């Protein structure tokens, strides 16, 4: 039994079910806790809501945060049943610790975009503008996927940027830009989509782009392995993929 530790993430609780789109019609029940990357904050509750329509006797609790923080919590004994990471490196930490129940499944991909204040008042046109002295830039910390991806993209573009701050996760970057506390931040396309009207997205060209790949796995010792694996199956089902696409995610 893994010891419970304090969770540093926000929790969302939803009823969960299966649907025929998963290929499994048998109802499921019980509870599971899903540790998920912060960029999934909008999409995963909707996935859970759709699953709820068929079986309200099961429940998902979502804990969202940076993938690196969640991976550390799991290796320290946090009671997670499913881990959904925004990168393969943090999932590999769980695999190496022999804490996965089965092979992780890729369920989505994402790409980067520059989030700027609505209307783009600083006329930021690309990554090179992030090095301008009149642009207040924020990035996610390099220890979290979005931060590492941002640095990789800047390196590809040959840009040396000096962020005013390094945030705990990608949603913190988005919030600073949307609140006017920063002029720009490198986030995911899905983040810009979620903040439509509050920020404007500036495209990053293909040659400088970095693709984020999202794997999910059941955590060994889950209190409800059947439901944990059923949720992952739903993510890769046509219905699950359709919901993720609505939020701007691409296929894995």
Give names to the regions the model predicted.
Residues 1-15:
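Sec-dependent bacterial lipoprotein signal peptides
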Residues 9, 17-53, 68, 72-75, ...:
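Exported/periplasmic ABC-transporter solute-binding proteins
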């Amino acid at each position: 039994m893994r010891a419970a530790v304090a969770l540093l993430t926000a929790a969302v609780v939803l009823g969960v079910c299966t649907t025929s789109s998963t290929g499994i019609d048998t109802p499921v029940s019980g509870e599971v806790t899903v540790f998920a990357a912060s960029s999934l904050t909008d999409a995963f509750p909707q996935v859970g809501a759709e699953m709820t329509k068929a079986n309200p006797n099961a429940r998902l609790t979502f804990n969202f945060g940076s993938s690196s923080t969640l991976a550390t919590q799991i290796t320290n004994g946090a009671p997670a049943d499913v881990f959904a990471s925004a990168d393969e490196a943090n999932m590999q930490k769980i695999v190496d610790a022999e804490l996965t129940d089965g092979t992780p499944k890729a369920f989505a991909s994402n790409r980067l975009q520059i989030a700027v204040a609505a209307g783009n008042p600083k006329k930021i046109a690309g990554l090179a503008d992030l090095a301008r002295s009149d642009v207040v830039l924020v990035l996610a910390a390099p220890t979290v996927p979005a931060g590492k991806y941002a640095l990789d993209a800047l390196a590809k573009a040959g840009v040396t940027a000096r962020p005013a701050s390094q945030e705990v996760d990608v949603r913190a970057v988005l919030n600073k830009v949307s609140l006017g506390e920063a002029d720009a931040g490198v986030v995911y396309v899905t983040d810009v989509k979620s903040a439509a009207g509050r920020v404007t997205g500036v495209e990053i060209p293909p040659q400088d782009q970095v693709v984020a790949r999202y794997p999910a796995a059941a955590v060994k010792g889950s209190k409800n392995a059947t439901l944990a694996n059923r949720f992952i199956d739903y993510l890769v089902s046509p219905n699950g993929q359709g919901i993720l696409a609505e939020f701007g995610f691409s296929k894995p």
